[in-house]
Design a protein with these regions (language model features):
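Short glycine-enriched, charge-decorated loop/helix-capping segments at active-site entrances
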Residues: 47-48, 166-167, 206-209, 269-275, ...
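Short flexible coil/turn linkers enriched for glycine and charged/polar residues
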Residues: 140-143, 153-155, 252, 262, ...
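Proteins enriched for Cys/Gly/acidic motifs involved in redox and nucleic-acid/cofactor modification
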Residues: 1-202, 241, 246, 252, ...
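A structural micro-motif
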Residues: 1, 29, 70, 92, ...
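Conserved SAM/AdoMet-binding glycine-rich loop
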Residues: 73, 81, 186-309, 320
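Terminal RNA-binding accessory module
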Residues: 342-430
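Hydrophobic, well-ordered secondary-structure elements that form the walls
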Residues: 258, 299, 319, 327, ...
């Protein structure tokens, strides 16, 4: 059969999409572009916000309208959270975020027998106990591979539905992760990105006293030719022991994405975030103590429920102290089924947007300073694609770098940085 997959959402969804591509192609099926004609269209959904749900519904409806005779299968967090709503959109298969192998078996069976009525196969995510090992790799055309080492989350932030769609923390074993990483190195990748719903919790469900730094050491030693990059982390991960051991790993990329969400302790408490602004700043200080100009990036939610002018001012002051190299800034988006959605003192959208603009202005200044600090330096760059008449890639700190050259796809080169290229760097290959 010919199949196509459309992915919405986070890197974990991207990972699971490439895993499904690997499995289906390995079974003899043909992957096509989503806009092309296919027998089966799989939509891998996201449900992190109400806006995400709407995007998923729109994509399902558009696919149904454009390809009325094709089989349409929907999986992912939106399908996990609202399976009956998805089934009501007249799709053929509805599955959640678990047991991808069984889901793909159903896809194949339904493609052969279109008389089968709509199937809804969604479990209770909170009752999951085992980590589902899927093939690691990269999306077609990508130069870095993703390696999912964890699933689930037990933080229960008041604004988030994901613990209910992904279940409790489940970790991949060190041995299994090392085996997959070695296979990726042999396949020609130069970089792997460790992904998970909450990788800071990796190991808490495994036997023995193991944590994320133990996994990092094992992976970096097992594949010394691969750059190893971390996904999003919680501030609690960044301890003196973590930094001391991590800084001794030459192939660990010095890019640390620490989820902030707010710089006000009062707001953080309402969010049920389990740290203070001062603890977050301590994480930043430790990283800069042990690494040379690490990229410290973050997420920020503006206009959370009950956020006062004073609290937002505290956040602005805090992010300037943290001096992030880049920020992802979002207005708070209500999500049905969460504690925050039921809280009083919801802010108007105009206030949320205004605060986003204020925070973005501060973020732009910090990003500019960080980029300028690299002018005149040499950085190893993994090139990925042609853009703006040049080749574009990323340095270990995940800053985008542009340079001229011949075919540099999936090539690692040293680049002397000569200046800025928008919100990126530009240089010459040495």
């Amino acid at each position: 059969m010919r199949y196509a997959i459309y992915t919405l959402g986070c890197k974990v969804n991207q990972y699971e999409t490439q895993a499904m591509e690997t499995i289906l192609t390995g079974r003899g099926h043909t992957l096509t572009e989503f806009d092309a004609e296919a027998d089966v269209y799989i939509i891998n959904t996201c449900s992190v916000t109400a806006v995400s749900d709407k995007k998923c519904r729109n994509m399902i409806r558009r696919t149904k309208r454009t390809h009325p005779d094709a089989l349409i299968a929907v999986c992912g967090c939106y399908a996990q959270a609202k399976p009956e709503e998805v089934a009501g959109l007249e799709v053929d298969l509805v599955a959640g975020t678990g047991d991808r192998m069984a889901f793909l078996d159903q896809v194949e069976q339904a493609a052969l027998d279109r008389s089968i009525p709509t199937q809804v196969s969604v479990d209770n995510a909170l009752k999951r106990h085992d980590f589902e090992v899927l093939p690691a790799g990269g999306l077609v055309g990508r130069t870095r591979a993703m390696l999912k080492v964890e699933d689930g989350c037990g933080n229960f932030c008041t604004y988030c539905i994901i613990p209910f769609t992904r279940g409790p923390v489940r970790s991949e074993s060190i041995d299994a992760a090392v085996t997959q990483a070695k296979a990726l190195a042999e396949a020609g990748y130069h970089e792997i990105v460790l992904t998970g719903i909450e990788i800071s919790s990796w190991g808490q469900d495994l036997e023995g006293d193991v944590s994320l730094i133990d996994l990092l050491e094992a992976l970096c030693h097992a594949v010394p030719t691969l750059r190893v990059r971390l996904g999003s982390l919680e501030p609690r991960t960044i301890t003196e022991d973590f930094c001391r051991r991590a800084s001794a790993l030459p192939n660990l990329c010095p890019h640390f994405h620490l989820s902030l969400q707010s710089g006000s302790d009062a707001t953080l408490k309402r969010m049920n975030r389990k740290y203070t602004a001062e603890r977050f700043l301590e994480s930043c200080r430790l990283l800069r103590q042990y690494f040379d100009r690490p990229a410290i990036t973050t997420d920020l939610i503006c206009g959370f429920v009950g956020e006062t002018e004073k609290e937002f001012a505290e956040t602005l002051a805090m992010i300037e102290k943290a001096d992030f190299s880049a920020m992802h800034i979002f207005p708070y988006s209500r999500r049905g089924g969460t504690v925050a959605d039921r809280m009083p003192d919801q802010l108007p959208n105009a206030v949320k947007d205004a605060r986003c603009h204020q925070a973005a202005a501060v973020a732009a200044q910090m990003e500019q300073r960080y980029l300028e600090s690299w002018v005149g330096e040499t950085l190893p760059v993994l090139f990925e694609e042609e853009a703006d008449g040049l080749w574009r890639g990323h340095a270990p700190n995940y800053v985008a770098v542009y340079a001229a050259g011949a075919d540099l796809h999936n090539v690692l080169k040293d680049v002397k940085i000569t200046g800025l290229h928008g919100q990126a760097l530009e240089g010459v290959i040495l």
